Curated annotation (Swiss-Prot):
Official protein name in the record: Transcriptional regulator MraZ
Keyword flag Oxidoreductase: no
Native source species: Clostridium acetobutylicum (strain ATCC 824 / DSM 792 / JCM 1419 / IAM 19013 / LMG 5710 / NBRC 13948 / NRRL B-527 / VKM B-1787 / 2291 / W)
A molecular function (GO) term: DNA-binding transcription factor activity
Extent of the signal sequence: none
Main location as per UniProt: cytoplasm
NCBIfam families recorded: division/cell wall cluster transcriptional repressor MraZ (TIGR00242)
Coiled coil: none
HAMAP family, sorted: MraZ
Length: 142
C-alpha cells in the first residue's frame, strides 16, 4: 500500500526520484500515465493489469467510456527505475502535469500520484469541502 507525501524535484534530464518507501512495492517496471486533476498516476504492473481489465470491459458504444479509455491509455508509459531510484518522465507527461521543478509524490493506496508543487498547493487550498466529501463517502459505505 502506498501512503505518505514526499517533496522532491525534477532534474535537468526530466528524471524524478521515486521515494524509497514506494520502490519495493512498485517493482522494476511500472506504469506512469496521465491522472485526473492534472497529476500523474503511477501503478505497479499488477494494479495496472487489474485496471486494464476493467477498462477493456467498458462499452465501445458509450462516448464517455471511449473518451476515458483514450485519455488513460494514450498517456501510459511502461517505465523503470535507474540505479539511483530515478525514473525518466516523458515530456508530454511533464507538460500535462505542469511540472516545472518541484514536485510532490503522494501515496494513494494502490497508486502513487505525482503533482507539480504549485498544483498540489492549489488543490489543497481550493474550495474542496472535505466535510461534504466525507458525507458522500458515508453514503457509499465508507
Amino acid at each position: 500500500m502506498f501512503i505518505g507525501e514526499y517533496n522532491h524535484a525534477l532534474d535537468t534530464k526530466n528524471r524524478i526520484i521515486i521515494p524509497s518507501k514506494f520502490r519495493e512495492e512498485l517493482g522494476d517496471n511500472f506504469i506512469l500515465t496521465k491522472g485526473l486533476d492534472g497529476c500523474l498516476y503511477v501503478y505497479p504492473l499488477g494494479e495496472w493489469k487489474v485496471l486494464e481489465e476493467k477498462l477493456k470491459k467498458l462499452p465501445l458504444t458509450n462516448h464517455n467510456a471511449r473518451a476515458f479509455v483514450r485519455f488513460f491509455f494514450s498517456g501510459a508509459n511502461e517505465v523503470s527505475l535507474d540505479k539511483q531510484g530515478r525514473v525518466l518522465v516523458p515530456q508530454n507527461l511533464i507538460e500535462y502535469a505542469s511540472i516545472n521543478k518541484e514536485i510532490i509524490s503522494i501515496g494513494v493506496s494502490t497508486r502513487i500520484e505525482i503533482w507539480s508543487k504549485e498544483k498540489w498547493v492549489e488543490y489543497n487550498e481550493s474550495s474542496v469541502d472535505m466535510n461534504a466529501i466525507a458525507e458522500k463517502m458515508s453514503e457509499l459505505g465508507i
